[in-house]
């Protein structure tokens, strides 16, 4: 049995015994290298400690002690709590916590660093009278405070007294203006008429009117602008419009090449209709010639004039506008460029004029009157 165990013993010494000395030597060499590296790290730590000691002499804002296991405790002079940081964070924090390398720029961010608290505008100062008109969604008080703080940073940018007057002026209600206080130049607009009950005839809604008026401050400003510069009487006369006049009994001669002249007496204008004026304008436009119609010249060619007051002049202007704007096919465009009317005063005769109607523009268009078709 002993021989059997001896034969099958795998741990027994054999002739081919392996040599492990080489492996042991390599392990010892690695351990020696680790020892040298640890020595280098200790030397580096000693150098860092020396550098920190030099920096502690120069920097007085904070103190940094470097304990073992790469962790430090930073103790600040301003009374903050102790915070554990890594070595890298501690070094960066120490370098950045010292005095600034560049001096502070004067005047930069002074509005943000100001210790003066900005004034808050009271809403009651802006709106003394409630207009009843909503200006938008309701915002929170904090948002209004922030907006007012942003607007009031530069207090000298506007005058509160003028702003208050302006807001008070624009918030006036229409019904606050009485009819007796409205000046003569006020304009009146009927918003809606009177409403009656269809069965009993009782008035259910009175008429409503809106009045527009000029503010006295605006009138005063216009007056000051008008009289800002004084002008002499001669300068004012030169600014006036010179009106051409004609003498009664003067004989008018016509020498026109491209203009047709139509003479009518004062009696004929009383019998003339708009259709007669339309025919003269149509013939002039279709013949590509200018035309002039004179009212107030007798058969002998002398000026007699037509007696017309202001109301009669307006009626004649209305008749001419009606004649040009109707019946023409196609319609005449830019009427004021085609036809005009002038009243030439007759000297030494009151409200007596030589009436001149002119077709002063040619059109590349053939016109017809719808009533003559």
UniProtKB/Swiss-Prot annotation:
Tissues of expression: Expressed in the germline.
Ranges annotated as spanning the membrane: none
UniProt region (SLFN-like fold), positions on chain: 247-373
Subcellular location(s) of the protein: Cytoplasm
Keyword Cytoplasm among record annotations: yes
Main subcellular localisation: cytoplasm
Protein's GO biological process: primary piRNA processing
One annotated Gene Ontology cellular component of this protein: endoribonuclease complex
Region (Disordered): 1-67
Signal peptide region: none
Keywords (A to Z) from UniProt: Cytoplasm
Chain's role: Component of the trimeric PUCH (precursor of 21U RNA 5'-end cleavage holoenzyme) complex, that acts as an endoribonuclease processing the 5'-end of precursor Piwi-interacting RNAs (piRNAs). The PUCH complex consists of tofu-1, tofu-2 and either slfl-3 or slfl-4, with tofu-2 exhibiting endoribonuclease activity. PUCH-mediated processing strictly requires a 7-methyl-G cap (m7 G-cap) and an uracil at position three (U3). PUCH also exhibits a strict bias for piRNA precursors with an A or G at position 1.
Domain notes: In mammalian Schlafen proteins, two SLFN-folds come together to form the nuclease domain. In tofu-1 and tofu-2, only one SLFN-like fold can be identified, suggesting that the two proteins may interact via their SLFN-like folds to form a functional nuclease.
Membership in a protein family: Belongs to the Schlafen family.
Assembly mode: Component of the trimeric PUCH (precursor of 21U RNA 5'-end cleavage holoenzyme) complex; consisting of tofu-1, tofu-2 and either slfl-3 or slfl-4; which is required for processing of piRNA precursors. Within the complex, interacts (via N-terminus) with tofu-2 (via N-terminus); the interaction stabilizes tofu-2 and may form a functional nuclease. Within the complex, required for the interaction of tofu-2 (via N-terminus) with slfl-3 (via N-terminus).
Identification of the protein by name: Schlafen-like protein 1
Protein source organism: Caenorhabditis elegans
Organism phylogeny: Eukaryota, Metazoa, Ecdysozoa, Nematoda, Chromadorea
Encoding gene per record: tofu-1
